[in-house]
Amino acid sequence: MLIDGAHNPQAAKQLAENMQTIFQNVPCVLLCAVMRDKNAAEVAHALSGFAGQAVCTVAEPGRGLPAEELSKLFACPAVAEEDPKKAYETAKKLAKEKEALLVVAGSLYLPEAIGIEKEAKDA
């Protein structure tokens, strides 16, 4: 699993460049959430460059773009799941099925919303 905030267009473009350089032949499943005050279309466009599949969710209710709305911005196949923990489970399952790298990106709030921060503290 790779975790990167990639919470704005510039950071998303940088992540996409790094993914294409370092993991150019590695299939990827993306778990993504974007805040309403960010340019979600540009973030999705950049992240679509390396993602074979996207699972879209909401990391911060009230501030986050709805998952369904975000999923429509991706050029790659994308599914929507409003509940971030369910979205994480879906993304993990897809990554395992596709033997793909799971990339968590698009919001600085997403790791905490899916419980990764707690897993790291408990490890």
Predicted regions and their residues:
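Residue-level recognition of the N-termini of beta-strands and the immediately preceding loop/turn
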Residues: 27-28, 100-102
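Glycine/aspartate-rich loop-and-adjacent alpha/beta segment that forms the canonical ThDP
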Residues: 107-123
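Glycine-rich beta-strand-to-loop/alpha-helix junction loops that act as flexible
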Residues: 6, 34, 59, 104-108
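Nucleotide phosphate-binding/pyrophosphate-handling subdomain across enzymes
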Residues: 1-53
